[in-house]
Amino acid sequence: FYIGGMGAKSTNFHKELFIRMGYEEEANKIQDLFMEGKRDEAARVLPDQLADDMALIGPKDRIRERLQAWRESKVTTMLVATTDKQTLREISELF
């Protein structure tokens, strides 16, 4: 929704962010499909790599391996999305 439908077609912060991340072709296609009312088709354009670039996903060891790059980036806030207490404990150990 954010890439395709937030703001005006010519002014969309989220689309511009994904373009800066190297996903220009996909961002343009997503927005075009979204504007045509083809939301499901637009969602299928999202590459799996984009999710991996945007989030620390996977087992604890994989997150640990990738966390240093995030610490060295411009990221200032991280969100943990889980309701599982054990997962929260494990993630807190990484910090």
Task: Give the residues covered by each predicted segment.
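C-terminal helical cap(s) of enzyme catalytic domains, especially alpha/beta-barrels
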Residues: 84-95
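An alpha-helical appendage that flanks or caps ligand/catalytic pockets
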Residues: 1-69
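A structural motif corresponding to the C-terminal end of an alpha-helix
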Residues: 69-76
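Hydrophobic faces of well-ordered beta-strands that scaffold small-molecule active sites
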Residues: 52, 76-81
